Amino acid sequence: MSKTIIEFKNVSKTYADTDTTVLKDISFELEEGKFYTLLGASGSGKSTILNIIAGLLDATDGDVILDNKRINDLPANKRNVHTIFQSYALFPNMNVFDNVAFALKIKGVDKKEIAKRVSESLKLVRLDGFEKRSITKLSGGQKQRVAIARAIIDRPKVLLLDESLSALDMKLRKDMQYELRELQQSLGITFIFVTHDQEEALAMSDWVFIMNEGEIVQSGTPTDIYDEPINHFVADFIGESNILNGRMIEDYLVEFNGQKFEAVDGGMRKNEPIEVVIRPEDIWFTLPDEGKFNVKVDTQLFRGVHYEIVAYDEFNNEWLIHSTHKAIVGETVGLDFDPEAIHIMRLNETEEEFDARIEEYVEEEETVGLANAVEEENAEEEAAIQEAVKEALENTMELTELAETVNEILQKQENEPESENKESGANK
């Protein structure tokens, strides 16, 4: 069973001078050795959580637990937590070695031990041999690695990263995503990463917290959040989406765009107003009148791996489609999608209500699915038995026919000598 390393219990943060509440009753548990991401727009409260964990801000209410100890009153330098800031906060007047060794020198660690641990840390971030290099001579990615090496040199329980990739160019940022994830897994310590970049959050994390206006709107694995957004905000914030108003006719049957469609969601009231989400990559073009409905292509952009196409249906709903096929602006085409592509969102549903509903109807599906599986297995066995019996009967018939043929041949052979004897006597 995984150990809880950090816990927030009903934590809030209010700035008294402006009476502004930036965190509202936040509660969560983080397990040791996992990669967590706090994802949200500016002002959502994500960096406030990071600073409270680091000891740079005090919580107004609630308890902050680190490694089973309440740390609300523990100074920042007494917490086994390190922070990597967006600016990296490296010392430009020191070389790489001295930057990485700084914390150990302050603690009075033996010089040989310092040299050993600096070497180990630089190897982990692939900067061995850079010990004497000036900080001012390093690239952005190399500075990032030095900051990480300095942060991990005394093996903190938790590493906090505050928008630490945002200063890098796109290619280097993608490369560092792989390196950070690999480093976290090799070290086995807890990473808490703050970003406004959805791609970074989805690519690196074991678990993502979506934040908005000081609250956690939804949390889950990257796949869960992308495939099952809880509300309009999450669906719109994570990736690109087509979001429409609709009505849940009954379980697994939804109405939108003036039509009824088979879906895979359930657990809602009949005729309940809902919102429908369909991702642009889950839609494909057909000939007119051969899909679910027709749209008219309005614009398209080439994005390298796909065309991003905007089209409008007869109700003037905008549709975003990702396609590897180029469209013709102004043409009418059909749109099609599978039932699995339709995600249903209830209006004003909390994360707790969402989780309970999903669990309830998934268990229902699993029970029905098991019964169906048993029934199908029994039917298959019965069919196999019937086939075996049929084959045995056919074999028996073939054997009977063969036996009759053999008997006829033997009888014929027995009769032939008698005929020959009669002919021989007549000749004499």
Swiss-Prot record:
SMART domains: AAA. GO terms for cellular component: ATP-binding cassette (ABC) transporter complex. Its EC number is 7.6.2.11. It is a peripheral membrane protein. GO terms for molecular function: ABC-type polyamine transporter activity; ATP binding; ATP hydrolysis activity. Keywords: ATP-binding, Cell membrane, Membrane, Nucleotide-binding, Translocase, Transport. SUPFAM superfamilies: MOP-like, P-loop containing nucleoside triphosphate hydrolases. It catalyses: ATP + H2O + polyamine-[polyamine-binding protein]Side 1 = ADP + phosphate + polyamineSide 2 + [polyamine-binding protein]Side 1. It holds the Pfam family ABC_tran. It is an enzyme of class 7 (translocase). It is found in: Cell membrane. It comes from the Bacteria. Residues 6-238 form the ABC transporter domain. Its main location: membrane. ATP binds at residues 40-47. The complex is composed of two ATP-binding proteins (PotA), two transmembrane proteins (PotB and PotC) and a solute-binding protein (PotD). Part of the ABC transporter complex PotABCD involved in spermidine/putrescine import. Responsible for energy coupling to the transport system. Belongs to the ABC transporter superfamily. Spermidine/putrescine importer (TC 3.A.1.11.1) family. This is Spermidine/putrescine import ATP-binding protein PotA. The gene is potA.
